[in-house]
Amino acid sequence: MAVPKRRMSRANTRSRRAQWKAEAPGLVTVSVAGQQRKVPRRLLKAARLGLVDLDKR
């Protein structure tokens, strides 16, 4: 594992950490029981099979 040679300043640490950002999941339109819904792509199969409750919103 890499060991830093010198201490990193607070400003450099925070600016480096600020590069990490959360992204919203890409939504895909799926029709369930005649209604169009937008779900994340990884839940597409579960939504079609009825394993996900889409009426919570």
Swiss-Prot record:
It comes from the Bacteria. Pfam families: Ribosomal_L32p (PF01783). InterPro entries: Ribosomal_bL32 (IPR002677), Ribosomal_zn-bd (IPR011332). Residues 1-20 are annotated as: Disordered. Residues 1-19 have a biased composition (Basic residues). One of its GO terms (cellular component) is large ribosomal subunit. Keywords: Ribonucleoprotein, Ribosomal protein. GO terms for molecular function: structural constituent of ribosome. GO terms for biological process: translation. HAMAP family: Ribosomal_bL32. Belongs to the bacterial ribosomal protein bL32 family. This is Large ribosomal subunit protein bL32. The gene is rpmF.
